[in-house]
């Protein structure tokens, strides 16, 4: 699996992920890029699950963003509908974390679109470790969103065997 974490704080939203791709109990690749920018750099998206499945979902999600002029929530709801009802998409096993300047969402293959509390998303096998670390840092420090995401990924990578220390981090400034 993997670890993807997204943190929203004050003037930025950050999303990061590790780079490990596993096949069973074998590490196949250590520098995969599981977090990327979409829709002219205005949206950050990350995936946990099958790599091929994630690329399909990224393409579908970006098409929905184009169709709905970058409206993140609308695009997420439409992707979730397609994912739940389309026979081919239903077989895909992945979770998407998406964020823009206004919202952070988790999209699942069950048709769920979830806006988490405190602007904190953590998915994948290392998600619970990253979430615990990020929540503690959010509540007890003044660190920025990207510093919290980086540290949460580091901690998850130390604990989860399916998460490595090769990280990708994307940051979107939030302007008032």
From Swiss-Prot:
The keyword Nucleotidyltransferase does not apply. GO terms for molecular function: metal ion binding; threonine-type endopeptidase activity. Coiled coil: none annotated. Na(+) binds at residues 157, 160, 163. One of its GO terms (cellular component) is proteasome core complex. The keyword S-adenosyl-L-methionine does not apply. Allosterically activated by HslU binding. It is found in: Cytoplasm. InterPro entries: ATP-dep_Prtase_HsIV_su, Ntn_hydrolases_N, Proteasome_sua/b, Proteasome_suB-type. GO terms for biological process: proteolysis involved in protein catabolic process. It is an enzyme of class 3 (hydrolase). Belongs to the peptidase T1B family. HslV subfamily. Protease subunit of a proteasome-like degradation complex believed to be a general protein degrading machinery. PANTHER family: ATP-DEPENDENT PROTEASE SUBUNIT HSLV (PTHR32194:SF0), METALLOPROTEASE TLDD (PTHR32194). This is ATP-dependent protease subunit HslV. The gene is hslV.
């Amino acid at each position: 699996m993997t670890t993807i974490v997204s943190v929203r704080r004050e003037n930025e939203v950050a999303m990061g992920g590790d780079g490990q791709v596993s096949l069973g109990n074998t590490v196949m690749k250590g520098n995969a890029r599981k977090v990327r920018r979409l829709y002219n750099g205005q949206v950050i998206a990350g995936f946990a699950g099958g790599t091929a499945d994630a690329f399909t979902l990224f393409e579908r999600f970006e098409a929905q963003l184009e169709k709905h002029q970058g409206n993140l929530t609308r695009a997420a709801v439409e992707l979730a509908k397609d994912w739940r009802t389309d026979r081919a998409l239903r077989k895909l096993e992945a979770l998407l974390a998406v964020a823009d300047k206004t919202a952070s969402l988790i999209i699942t293959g069950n048709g769920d679109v979830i806006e988490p509390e405190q602007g904190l998303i953590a998915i994948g096998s290392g998600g619970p470790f990253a979430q615990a670390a990020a929540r503690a840092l959010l509540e007890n420090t003044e660190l920025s969103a990207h510093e919290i995401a980086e540290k949460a990924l580091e901690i998850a990578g130390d604990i989860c065997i399916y998460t490595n220390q090769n990280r990708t981090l994307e940051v979107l400034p939030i302007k008032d």
